[in-house]
From Swiss-Prot:
The gene is rpsP. This is Small ribosomal subunit protein bS16. Belongs to the bacterial ribosomal protein bS16 family. One of its GO terms (molecular function) is structural constituent of ribosome. HAMAP family: Ribosomal_bS16 (MF_00385). InterPro entries: Ribosomal_bS16, Ribosomal_bS16_CS, Ribosomal_bS16_dom_sf.
C-alpha cells in the first residue's frame, strides 16, 4: 500500500479549495483518505496554506510520498527543509 500526501478538491465550481490529505494511492482524488493534514486556498491573493507541521512531518517520516504540487507547497511553508535536514 503506497501512501501519498496529495490534494483533495472541494469548494464550488470555478472556486476550488483543497484539503491536503494522506491517502492510499489507489483511492480516488476526492475519495477515502487516512488523515487530513491541512488546507490550501488558491483563491486568496496571496494563496493561503494551513498545514499541521507535526502531522505532516510524522507522515513524511513514516514514508508517505508527497505529490509534486504538495512538495512545492511544503517547500513554500518550510516543512520540506525540516524533513530533509532535521535538527541534530
Amino acid at each position: 500500500m503506497a501512501i501519498k500526501i496529495r490534494l483533495a478538491r472541494a469548494g464550488a465550481k470555478k472556486k476550488p479549495f483543497y484539503q491536503v490529505v494522506v491517502a492510499d494511492c489507489r483511492c480516488r482524488r476526492d475519495g477515502r483518505f487516512i488523515e487530513n493534514v491541512g488546507t490550501y486556498d488558491p483563491n486568496k491573493n496571496p494563496a493561503v496554506y494551513n498545514l499541521e507541521e507535526g502531522k505532516t512531518l510524522e507522515w513524511l517520516g513514516k514514508g508517505a510520498q508527497p505529490t509534486d504540487t504538495v512538495k512545492q507547497i511544503l517547500k513554500k511553508v518550510g516543512i520540506w527543509e525540516k524533513f530533509v535536514s532535521p535538527a541534530a
